[in-house]
Amino acid sequence: MNWIKKTLRFGEKIKTIIKARATKTEIANSDWTSCCKGPILKKDLEENLWVCPSCNKHHRISPRQRFDIIFGKNNYEVLKTPIPQDDPLNWNDAKPYKDRLKAARKKTGMDCGMMVVNTNILNLKITAIASDFDFVGGSIGAAEGEAFLYGIQHAIENEQPFVVFTSGGGMRMMESLISLSQMTRTTLAINELKKNNLPYIVVLTDPTAGGITASYAMLGDLHLAEPGALIAFAGARVIQGTVREELPEGFQRSEYVEKTGFVDLIVERKDLREKIGSLLSILLKKNSAINSSENETSEDSRALTKAAS
């Protein structure tokens, strides 16, 4: 019977250890977080733009944090975007979709997973969008699709460049075909932006995957990426199981994706403001020259037509 008592005592110790572990809420509210070399104060991480000073890991941040860093606090206007009906399919799995949305809104303070802003960068007026990974994994549903289209429309109406900061796991399964249709809608909207000769810059952040990668994330005039960002369509294990080969080191990270030509530049978070501003200046001058050339060609054609008649 002695071994039974020992087993019971051991079980009680395990229960005590489990109870002593911090909850997700306690971890989120803590002054500390962890990175490569152990615990680090969130305050120190924030002062370094949420980049680890030891390993240079670019931690995930919210749209508002990102906009504060790149555009400056109180230097942007958050635009109110249309919000369609919640849960049109009455989706229910381990947790009702409506409850997931309520929890996401409470956690992020956002109505949907995308924030659209009107702002300026180096004296250039722009429209910008950023996704929040904490909002149902940054996935794209009808509300996010509406936000993206609203941002494009605002950019076209105000003749502004369009900058997108991607972050998310793809299309939202709880909205099925409604979610998948956002790939088409965002692509068509980008085509309209390009017809108006307005620059479209994509900044790929960790993680960018699935249908996001397969649609608007790869349609920019230029693609920038933060260091170490996961950029993929399918997961590495899925690919490895399909090709039955060992994948290269760093596969699907921004450094590897840059080598294959899908990313133009890898830019540190601290340098994004200057880099985006300078690239937009170049693109705007280029597009202005193209428009001027097209106008001259059109005038020449009219003159020739008039002379011929």
UniProtKB/Swiss-Prot annotation:
Binds 1 zinc ion per subunit. Belongs to the AccD/PCCB family. It comes from Pelagibacter ubique (strain HTCC1062). InterPro entries: AcCoA_carboxyl_beta, Acetyl_CoA_COase_Trfase_b_su, ClpP/crotonase-like_dom_sf, COA_CT_N. Keywords: ATP-binding, Cytoplasm, Fatty acid biosynthesis, Fatty acid metabolism, Lipid biosynthesis, Lipid metabolism, Metal-binding, Nucleotide-binding, Transferase, Zinc, Zinc-finger. Its cofactor is Zn(2+). It is found in: Cytoplasm. It catalyses: N(6)-carboxybiotinyl-L-lysyl-[protein] + acetyl-CoA = N(6)-biotinyl-L-lysyl-[protein] + malonyl-CoA. Signal peptide: none annotated. Its EC number is 2.1.3.15. The keyword ATP-binding applies. One of its GO terms (biological process) is fatty acid biosynthetic process. This is Acetyl-coenzyme A carboxylase carboxyl transferase subunit beta. Pathway: Lipid metabolism; malonyl-CoA biosynthesis; malonyl-CoA from acetyl-CoA: step 1/1. Component of the acetyl coenzyme A carboxylase (ACC) complex. Biotin carboxylase (BC) catalyzes the carboxylation of biotin on its carrier protein (BCCP) and then the CO(2) group is transferred by the transcarboxylase to acetyl-CoA to form malonyl-CoA. Its main location: cytoplasm. Residues 29-298 form the CoA carboxyltransferase N-terminal domain. GO terms for cellular component: acetate CoA-transferase complex. The keyword Iron-sulfur does not apply.
